[in-house]
């Protein structure tokens, strides 16, 4: 019998839960409005619900009235933005994911030691912009192997590398291998800077791919980790669609006769997953549902001390 295989874990990670709760608790404690620098997480459903509750999402701190509260998003911010907030008398509350903060701290420490930092990631992504701000003159961003091959450093130069927390493990491994081939003495952290949730969601998806011929990744198109999930499937020859609303689950699926995999990015609410699942069952009523558990997650991050 044809079936839907639901990946587990999927959806919200500990950092996303903490970030959303930070905004919700701030609104409960101080009332509206609460300003948020950038979308708190990259998911339109989450942002719209928080906006309805009184959150105001801004990209420029000049939009925030003096002496107001502003929350920094889960993706992190450069030190210059923290300084600007202080200069403008803003009360900053930091919802940066702890695993992103770990990368900031490592970059800052190794830059002070005189290393040049190779930062693997998407240079326009807000997380990379924040990390690069820790030591802009000592950081080079690389997105692919070609950019590794173009690096101007010698094998003797003191180099340190880290990655964006939401990268594809496949792509990161290829880039790291190229880096180590050129620079055998390059340093890094003892454990991967790709976060546990990214690794788990990609691992869970890889686990089911031999059993399916089509995958729905439920997530926002702006979400890095959701896009990487789609790429994980496509890299292994499985058709994948990134959807963020049940209306995007279309009759296209009727062209496929095999099992269907479903996963969700780390900023995707479970109710959106369930709505997409219901739409799929309307299109193909005789589908059974099977849960595939890859690993249990029990990570919890404490809310900022101000709350």
Swiss-Prot record:
Which amino acids does the record list as binding isopentenyl diphosphate? 42, 75, 125, 223-225, 267
Which Gene3D superfamilies does the record match to this protein? 3.40.50.11270, 4-hydroxy-3-methylbut-2-enyl diphosphate reductase, catalytic domain (3.40.1010.20)
Q: Which positions does UniProt annotate for [4Fe-4S] cluster binding?
A: 13, 97, 195
Q: What is its EC number?
A: 1.17.7.4
**Active-site positions, per UniProt?**
127
What InterPro entries does the record tag this protein with?
Answer: LytB/IspH (IPR003451)
The source's domain of life comes to Bacteria
The note on cofactor binding and number reads: Binds 1 [4Fe-4S] cluster per subunit.
Which cystines does this chain contain?
Answer: none
Name the cofactor(s).
[4Fe-4S] cluster
What keywords is this UniProt entry annotated with? 4Fe-4S, Iron, Iron-sulfur, Isoprene biosynthesis, Metal-binding, Oxidoreductase
Q: GO terms for molecular function, please?
A: 4 iron, 4 sulfur cluster binding; 4-hydroxy-3-methylbut-2-enyl diphosphate reductase activity; metal ion binding
Enzymatic reactions: isopentenyl diphosphate + 2 oxidized [2Fe-2S]-[ferredoxin] + H2O = (2E)-4-hydroxy-3-methylbut-2-enyl diphosphate + 2 reduced [2Fe-2S]-[ferredoxin] + 2 H(+); dimethylallyl diphosphate + 2 oxidized [2Fe-2S]-[ferredoxin] + H2O = (2E)-4-hydroxy-3-methylbut-2-enyl diphosphate + 2 reduced [2Fe-2S]-[ferredoxin] + 2 H(+)
Which annotated residues bind dimethylallyl diphosphate? 42, 75, 125, 223-225, 267
Q: Which CDD domains match?
A: lytB_ispH
| Pfam families according to UniProt | LYTB (PF02401)
Q: Which family does it belong to?
A: Belongs to the IspH family.
- Protein name per UniProt: 4-hydroxy-3-methylbut-2-enyl diphosphate reductase
UniProt organism field: Chlamydia trachomatis serovar L2 (strain ATCC VR-902B / DSM 19102 / 434/Bu)
Origin organism lineage:
Bacteria, Pseudomonadati, Chlamydiota, Chlamydiia, Chlamydiales
This protein's gene is called ispH
């Amino acid at each position: 019998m044809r079936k839907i295989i639901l990946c587990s874990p999927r959806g919200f990670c500990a950092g996303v839960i903490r970030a959303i709760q930070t905004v919700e608790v701030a609104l409960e404690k101080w009332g509206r409005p609460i300003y948020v620098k950038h979308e708190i997480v990259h998911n339109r459903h989450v942002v719209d619900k928080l906006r309805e509750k009184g959150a105001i999402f801004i990209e420029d701190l000049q939009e925030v009235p003096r002496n107001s509260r502003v929350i920094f998003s889960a993706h992190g911010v450069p030190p210059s933005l923290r300084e600007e907030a202080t200069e403008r008398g803003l009360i900053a509350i930091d919802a940066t994911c702890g695993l992103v903060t770990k990368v900031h701290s490592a970059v800052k420490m190794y830059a002070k030691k005189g290393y040049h930092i190779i930062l693997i990631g998407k240079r326009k992504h807000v997380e990379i912009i924040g990390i690069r701000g820790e030591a802009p003159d000592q950081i080079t961003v690389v997105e692919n192997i070609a950019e590794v091959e173009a690096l101007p450093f010698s094998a003797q130069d003191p180099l340190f590398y880290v990655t964006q927390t939401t990268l594809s493990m496949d792509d990161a491994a290829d880039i790291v291998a190229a880096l180590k081939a050129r620079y055998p003495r390059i340093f890094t952290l003892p454990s991967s800077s790709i976060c546990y949730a990214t690794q788990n969601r990609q691992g869970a998806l890889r686990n089911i791919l031999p059993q399916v011929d089509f995958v729905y990744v439920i997530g926002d198109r702006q979400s890095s980790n959701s896009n990487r999930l789609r790429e994980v499937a496509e890299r292994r020859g499985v058709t994948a669609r990134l959807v963020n609303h049940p209306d995007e689950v279309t009759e296209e699926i009727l062209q496929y006769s095999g099992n269907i995999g479903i996963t969700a990015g780390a900023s995707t609410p479970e109710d959106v997953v369930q709505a997409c699942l219901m739409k799929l069952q309307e299109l193909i009523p005789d589908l059974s549902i099977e849960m595939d558990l890859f690993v249990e997650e029990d990570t919890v991050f404490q809310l900022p001390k101000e709350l």
